[in-house]
Amino acid sequence: MPEAKTRSKRGSTRTNMLMSAAQVMRERGASGVTIDEVLARSGAPRGSVYYHFPEGRNQILAEALRWAGDAITESIDTAAERGALPLVRNFSEFWERTLMESDFGAGCPVVAAAIGCTNDEAQLTAIASDIFCRWRDALARAFVADNFDTAAAESLAVTCIASLEGAVVLCRSIRTTEPLRQVAREMEFLIKSREFVRRNGLPTGGH
């Protein structure tokens, strides 16, 4: 079994490096991710960089972003099976935990990659776009399952993601999770209001 143990160790080293890179990206953005910092946080030997990531830093950035995006997407897909409202609550609670556990030091790596990459890191914008689209599609499917039409489902999905991600940025800035809670409450009110209108139509005036 020594060979299996070696493969497991190599896989663990690679994963630890990706986790470390994703964490730095949450805190400092893509431009803050350096090989030295990834090695320091992961405890990996320097020789492991080009063994696991022959294309160097850009490969680490791209794969770390995909790794982080996949982890969040998996959580979203699971919550989406319970409906749109539980998904919005789950998304809000996930970011609230992340902010509190990091003492407001860590935000969303996907947002960081989307708005903070340099020309040399342009590939990250495309990866971030793909991740956001997957989140939007998962949330839209949840709204469709709750009997919203496709156009309304997509509009609500984009509104929820944009509002919650914006709230995360605001929370980090003022070091409180209250904006996230406020946005989550407003999103819940909006969803319930749209559901009421869907079922009963808009008021036509009069008393």
What is the predicted role of each segment?
Residues 87-90, 101-126:
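Amphipathic alpha-helical segments used for helix-helix packing
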Residues 16, 20, 24-63:
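Helix-turn-helix
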Residues 1-12, 195-207:
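N-terminal intrinsically disordered/low-complexity leader segments
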Residues 75-106, 156-160:
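Hydrophobic alpha-helical connector segments
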Residues 109-112, 151-170, 182, 186-189:
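Hydrophobic alpha-helical segments that form the core
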Residues 120-122, 132-157, 194-200:
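Hydrophobic alpha-helical bundle segments that form small-molecule/ligand-binding pockets
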Residues 65-71:
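Short, basic, alpha-helical segments at the C-terminal edge of helix-turn-helix-like DNA-binding modules
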Residues 98-101, 141, 161-179, 191-199:
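Amphipathic C-terminal alpha-helical segment
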